[in-house]
């Protein structure tokens, strides 16, 4: 086997592992978002929607709701920052472990919807530090607007004769989030408030799986320091 062929095989395997991780984390995000929406009434990973909802609430005179949503936006930003700091200080998998702990804390906050809302958003921000790219291609985990946009632009270029098909992977986060949201809705219907324990356990299992990924591959899933 030539060196070049070996490198291609390793790259293909590394990309497959990265995409599987992206799909799993997006599934986790979709599940958490659906549970948050159905149990609290607001999105916990869709910040574009929360931005619009905050603006509408303020204009309609609902200052309390508007400020809560703005607080959620701030929490999402801080969660991203915390996730990156943990990822750099330790390993990207540590961010997943942190998210699992945050989700468990949120599950314990029964009767405190505002605190649970902010905690869930912070967790969804932090999870984005787990995977930022696949072989140099940016991917989103807890939001799919950008992924669908990149998919659409890639489709347009392909229709115009550009045969680079790397854009196809952008559909993976959407599929993961869609499937996860269905699961989250089913969990709320069947288990009510207990549903939130499932994302916490799922994040813990994801952490265990992520620790099996070779360390030398991990640098390909996050932006350079």
Swiss-Prot record:
| Compartment(s) where it occurs, according to its Swiss-Prot or TrEMBL record | Cell membrane
User: For this UniProt entry, what's an example GO CC term?
Assistant: plasma membrane
**Which top-rank group of organisms is this from?**
Bacteria
How does the protein's chain sit in the membrane according to the entry?
Multi-pass membrane protein
**Entry protein name:** UPF0700 transmembrane protein RA0705
Locate the transmembrane regions by residue number.
17-37, 66-86, 95-115, 117-137, 168-188, 194-214
Pfam families listed in its UniProt record: DUF1275
Would you identify the family this protein belongs to, as annotated? Belongs to the UPF0700 family.
Keywords, sorted A to Z: Cell membrane, Membrane, Plasmid, Transmembrane, Transmembrane helix
């Amino acid at each position: 086997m030539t060196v070049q062929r070996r490198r291609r095989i390793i790259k293909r395997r590394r990309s497959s592992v990265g995409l599987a991780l992206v799909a799993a984390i997006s599934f986790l995000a979709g599940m958490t978002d659906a549970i948050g929406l159905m149990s609290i009434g607001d999105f916990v990973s869709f910040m574009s929607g929360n931005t619009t909802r905050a603006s509408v609430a303020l204009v309609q005179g609902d200052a309390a709701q508007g400020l809560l949503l703005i607080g959620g936006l701030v929490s999402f930003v801080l969660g991203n920052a915390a996730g990156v700091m943990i990822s750099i200080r330790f390993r990207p998998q540590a961010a997943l472990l942190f998210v699992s702990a945050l989700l468990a804390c949120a599950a314990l906050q029964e009767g405190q919807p505002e605190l649970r809302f902010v905690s869930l958003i912070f967790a969804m921000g932090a999870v984005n530090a787990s995977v930022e790219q696949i072989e140099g291609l940016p991917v989103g985990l807890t939001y799919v607007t950008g992924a669908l946009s990149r998919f659409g632009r890639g489709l347009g270029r392909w229709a115009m004769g550009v045969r680079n098909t790397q854009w196809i992977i952008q559909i993976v986060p959407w599929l993961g989030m869609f499937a996860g949201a269905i699961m989250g809705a089913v969990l709320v219907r069947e288990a009510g408030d207990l549903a939130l324990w499932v994302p916490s356990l799922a994040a813990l299992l994801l952490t265990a799986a992520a620790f099996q990924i070779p360390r030398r591959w991990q640098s390909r899933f996050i932006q350079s320091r």
